[in-house]
UniProtKB/Swiss-Prot annotation:
Name of the coding gene: rpsD
GO cellular component: small ribosomal subunit
Domain S4 RNA-binding per the UniProt entry, residue ranges: 94-157
Function: One of the primary rRNA binding proteins, it binds directly to 16S rRNA where it nucleates assembly of the body of the 30S subunit. With S5 and S12 plays an important role in translational accuracy.
Subunit structure: Part of the 30S ribosomal subunit. Contacts protein S5. The interaction surface between S4 and S5 is involved in control of translational fidelity.
Keyword Hydrolase: no
Entry keyword Transit peptide: no
Any GO BP annotation: translation
Name of the protein described by the UniProt record: Small ribosomal subunit protein uS4
Source organism of the structure: Mycoplasma mobile (strain ATCC 43663 / 163K / NCTC 11711) (Mesomycoplasma mobile)
Length: 199
């Protein structure tokens, strides 16, 4: 399944959940928080399968990755020690594009992925342009010198809050620890995703 590149607002309405994690897509004069379409306000009762699938899709769209990457990440988490659901979310959080987003270099994960693709960052001093690359504790991410005057990046640096598991000065950041489950989105029910893939 390909990556969704359409309007974020439509996806958020479908899920009844802000996939930007800010709620901004529900403002700007767009107050319709029900699902899109003619019958959007009459959201039908979902089957057990539908409930599990909706939760999976919600998280997949939130992190902006395709089905294959999502499933492969879950397979790694399923083999890890500890709670599978928590390990799964922590792996999603460890993607390079997500760390760039958490460091405040971008307003959204979609924007962060685009910045990574365009080669704006160094990982441990070397060019890094693969959004799905895993970042480990102790790794440093730095905005390249030639990118330090990009207006969209500077605007994000000025307005975004840096995640507490990251240490950062203006143009350089370091992953200092793995985030705890309580620090991640509380509207996610990862147990439903675990059940979906383990059926």
């Amino acid at each position: 399944m390909s990556r969704y590149v359409g309007p974020v607002f439509k996806r958020s309405r479908r899920f009844g959940f802000s996939i930007l994690e800010t709620g901004k897509e529900f403002v700007k004069g767009k107050q319709r928080q029900y699902a899109p379409g003619q019958h959007g306000q009459r959201r039908g009762k979902l089957s057990d399968f539908g409930i599990h699938q909706l939760e999976k899709q919600k998280v997949r769209f939130m992190y902006g990755i395709n089905e294959r990457q999502f499933r492969n990440t879950f397979a790694i988490a399923n083999k890890a020690k500890g709670v599978t659901g928590t390990a799964f979310l922590q792996l999603l959080e460890s993607r390079l594009d997500n760390i760039v987003y958490r460091m405040g270099f971008a307003q959204t994960r979609r924007q962060a992925r685009q910045l990574v693709n365009h080669g704006h960052f160094l990982l441990n001093g070397k060019k890094a342009d693969i959004p799905s690359q895993r970042i480990n504790v102790g790794d440093t991410i730095e905005l390249r010198a030639k990118s330090q005057n990009v207006p969209t990046i500077l605007a994000s640096i000025e307005t975004r809050v840096v995640a507490p598991w990251i240490e950062k000065d203006k143009f350089k950041g370091k992953l200092i620890r793995v985030p705890e489950r309580k620090e991640l989105n509380q509207e996610i029910n990862e147990a439903l995703i675990v059940e979906f893939y383990n059926k």
